[in-house]
């Protein structure tokens, strides 16, 4: 079967590209377009291949291949490998004579914006799931390969299917790991890896017709954020330091699924 997904994300923030020191990207909306192909080789084996492209608030490019094996008593195991092209941000500072003269005389470097670079992220993961009547429980762990190091993110989830269509559901999830949940990697990089990051989410999906399903998902991410700061009393001698703190990020995702 083939499935097309359209994901929409809205974020608060500046209405222009002139961001404040705590905003890595301006506010607005982002769109992700995803295509997916699923094939059942037998009653016990299936594979799924998907790829996605996005404007902002999502990784630029993602691709994933998954294999699933169906066991007795409604148990499932799966494995997947994926690739994502995500953004990393560093603060940009420039020397400003007027700022230096109007201050206390110990700093003349003024924040002027964010430098953005792209980072390749490889992911390998496994999943275990169990269906109990109208409830599906699952747990999965992802290993992320980034900057020659491995990091992890573990997630648990539950879906309740109140209808008999197999698609309408209410779902909840939570995750913890040394890497943040994949959906916020653009906001978390750099510096978020090797520290504890958490996420909780709640949402649902409704089947409008046999070919169209709509969904709404809200998530709350708490992630470790690391940024650079430049100070100095001379344009020839900048002093760079690192500031760290935990940040909260709230997302609301609107989703449209079209299958055929």
Language model region names:
Residues 9-14, 22-32, 52-63, 85-90, ...:
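Solvent-exposed loop/turn segments connecting transmembrane beta-strands
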Residues 32-34, 62-66, 76, 123-125, ...:
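Membrane-embedded beta-strand positions in outer-membrane beta-barrel channels/transporters
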Residues 159, 167-223, 228-235:
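Outer membrane beta-barrel transmembrane domains
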Residues 2, 40-49, 73-79, 132-139, ...:
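Repeated loop/turn-to-beta-strand initiation elements of outer-membrane beta-barrel proteins
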Residues 206, 245-260:
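Outer-membrane beta-barrel "beta-signal"
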Residues 96-186:
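Detector for outer-membrane/organellar transmembrane beta-barrel domains
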């Amino acid at each position: 079967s083939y499935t097309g997904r359209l994901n929409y994300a809205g974020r608060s923030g500046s209405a222009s590209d002139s961001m404040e020191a705590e905003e890595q990207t301006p506010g607005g909306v982002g769109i992700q377009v995803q295509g997916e192909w699923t094939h059942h080789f037998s009653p016990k084996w299936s594979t799924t291949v998907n790829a996605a492209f996005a404007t902002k608030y999502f990784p630029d490019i993602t691709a994933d291949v998954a294999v699933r094996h169906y066991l007795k008593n409604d148990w499932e195991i799966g494995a997947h490998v994926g690739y994502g092209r995500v953004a990393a941000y560093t603060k940009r500072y420039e020397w400003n004579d007027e700022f230096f003269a109007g201050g206390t005389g110990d700093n003349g470097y003024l924040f002027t914006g964010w430098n953005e670079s792209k980072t390749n992220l490889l992911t390998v993961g496994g999943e275990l799931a169990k269906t109990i009547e109208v409830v599906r429980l699952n747990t999965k762990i992802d290993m992320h390969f980034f900057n020659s190091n491995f990091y992890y993110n573990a997630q648990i989830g539950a879906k309740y299917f109140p209808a008999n269509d197999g698609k309408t559901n209410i779902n909840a999830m939570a995750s913890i790991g040394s890497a943040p949940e994949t959906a916020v990697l653009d906001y978390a990089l750099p510096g978020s890896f090797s520290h504890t990051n958490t996420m909780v989410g709640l949402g649902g999906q409704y089947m409008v017709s046999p070919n169209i399903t709509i969904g709404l998902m809200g998530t709350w991410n708490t992630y470790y954020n690391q940024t650079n700061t430049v100070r100095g009393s001379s344009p020839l001698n900048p002093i760079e330091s690192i500031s760290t703190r935990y940040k909260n990020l709230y997302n609301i995702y609107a989703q449209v699924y079209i299958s055929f």
